[in-house]
Amino acid sequence: MHAKPAEESSLYLMIDNFQVIAAQFPFSVLQLLSALKGTAVHVIFLSRSFWQLPIQDLMHVCYISKEDFFLRKEDIICFAEELGISLTEKQAMHIQKETGGWAAFVSLYLQNGCEEVEWEKLSRLMEDLFWRRQEDILKKALLRLAQFETVDVEMVRTLTEDIADLKQMGEWFYSLPLLHYDAERQRYCLCALLREFLLYRLHNASFLTQWDSYHRCGCWYREHGETKKAVAAFYKVLDYAGILSCDLTGLLFEKFDKLSYTEIAGEILRHCPMETKQRYPLSLLRLCYALFADAAFTEYQQLLEEAKDIICDGNDPNLLGEWELIAAFQDFPNLEKMEQHYQRAKRLMTAPSVIFTVGEPFLFGSISMWRLFYTKPGELERTAETLERVMQLYNSLTAGHGSGAAELYRGEACCAQGRFADAEIYGYQALYASLQRKNACVTYGAVLLLGTNAVYRGDLAAWKRTLDYLEDPAHTYAFLKDTFLDVCMKETVQSYFAMLQPKESRLRKRLQAASNRLYDLNFTNSAIKGVRIPRIILKKNYHKAIGILEVALKIDTRLIALPSQLFIHTNLALCYFAIGRSRKAAEHLEFVLSLAERDQVLSFAAYFREYLEPLFYLPSVSRKYAAVIQEIRSLPIQNIPAVPEWKAFTPKQENEWEEPLSKREREIAELAARGLRNGEIAEMLHISEGTVKNHLKIVFRKLNIDRRSSLRGRLR
């Protein structure tokens, strides 16, 4: 090289598989070779990886890396033009993202008309060009990383430490297509195509290979606080011990590949070996809470009994106290009986509960306390007093886990009774108490209460402020971010507001959290399912609404307490009335008026009184509930805004809604109106006097009168 060969001749020194001998080349030699610019000597290195070579420190070096062979967005557009295909920039970016710019795969996409390529073709190409050429040990490492879109150096070290050291893994990865190393962030990014292929290979691998990958992935997620992802990974291989080893907090109603958390809890109950369950009693109690929250009452009871046997064997008073906190739901919503469990827990526990912490939503994420605990007519106020006492005890055991709940119940009760000033005070008390202790469900409940209260008073400015508060991401609790429960609680508030203010465009959107189906009804979604019913009614699907509501009345009363029943009966009254069945409408309205009479629960009926008004004239209703009907009519409350869809319920003259008289009844009524006695009518119509008397009773009831002198005017 130093002999300075003649100008007309050149020396090419090619060193292949440089990665094998790189350690034998001192850096000074490489620097010397790179300084031969302008000579006839050309040195070419070929390697599957230059990962450890500081090329940027070498002078006069030209190099081509694997990234140079990948097509950029602009390259893909030019490639497509050569094939006579016109691509938009957006299409090119999509193809680049999907293929990583690997030319062979870009070509497949373009040949397929820029549509998604059949997975069989992609898989075969990956198999031929990439997978078959890799060593088994590298395949094993890649399958462990298949769950991640990006992996940093520490993740590679942890997940592959038994396969090779970090340096060796780095050299392997550097040589792989579709795996990009971000030196600045020190992480690897798996192209979507590579990740999809690896997941496909993993899905079709042996169970031992799957276990190796998913178990290690689950352990990584668990140790880094990503519990939901950890549970999903462990469940892939039915690793029940792995699931129970996680801190199963804040997972209520989450989905794992379309499987609910409750279903996973049920599987653990049925299939997890007892020796595994015995190692994780706290996790069993958390699963009990999840089962009850999702209305799986039978499974809750079974697992609760198993957990008690395990805990009693351990002789841990604090753990037994935790069991009592969970066991209290056996007697839900009986506050007095629940209180007995809390008292026993108080005697056992020497530290705050480790189950009912900030991250575990209070009372299943239900945002209404009176929908849970108002269960007996005539006991609205007494329940408020009991709840206040019980919550004080519960909060002492859980470091304030239920803060604001008692105030929320009182505020809801006041709002329902039309005591709007008191309701606002309690609403703010509940809001600030819950914010202090991060009790999310009470926070949302207080927002709903304050907004509803503002609507009832006609203060739309105040109502819109609550809506702004709800929509501001800054007010979302960090531990609830991206959870299904947060979506459900927000949409419960939004959908209730949409029912009260149907003209508000901000609330006209598709709801994600619940459907009209009843088979998956639970404490959290029952409210949102309920307030969807008016949407069905507004579309005039009265028979469908009646079917749903009638079935709902037969559901376990733990899920459908008095406030829910009030809502259901009100809607049933409107629906039956709309299809011309006034008698059935009156039966359901009587429930509403009876509750209003006993506990002064007037606001809901008063808000819809414009549409209920015709029903107030029904004879069976007007005579029995005249006083409470007058209270509903006179309550100072804003009426629901008129919308075209509600025109079916627009009030008309009262006699238009009376039950029609039969031909015989009208005949007898007209004769009686002319002053004929019962005997004279009987003789004229050739019927008995008793028959005349019975027909007149029916006429009086239908026309809502109590004397014969009123007949002429009513008939007219």
Please provide the spans of the model-predicted regions.
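Conserved P-loop NTPase "ATPase switch" module shared by AAA+ and STAND
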Residues: 4-26
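Alpha-helical sensor/transducer elements of the RecA-like P-loop NTPase core
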Residues: 12, 28-94, 104-109, 194
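Amphipathic alpha-helical "lid/sensor" segments that cap RecA-like P-loop NTPase cores
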Residues: 63, 81-140, 144-153, 161-162, ...
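C-terminal boundary/linker of central alpha/beta nucleotide-binding cores
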Residues: 90, 124-204, 212
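Linker/hinge segments immediately adjacent to helix-turn-helix/homeobox DNA-binding domains
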Residues: 112-123, 531-539, 543-565, 569-663, ...
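Extended alpha-helical scaffolding segments used for macromolecular assembly and cargo binding
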Residues: 208-283, 290, 299
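Internal alpha-solenoid helical repeat scaffolds
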Residues: 275-446
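Helix-turn-helix DNA-binding segment
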Residues: 647-697, 701-706, 713-716
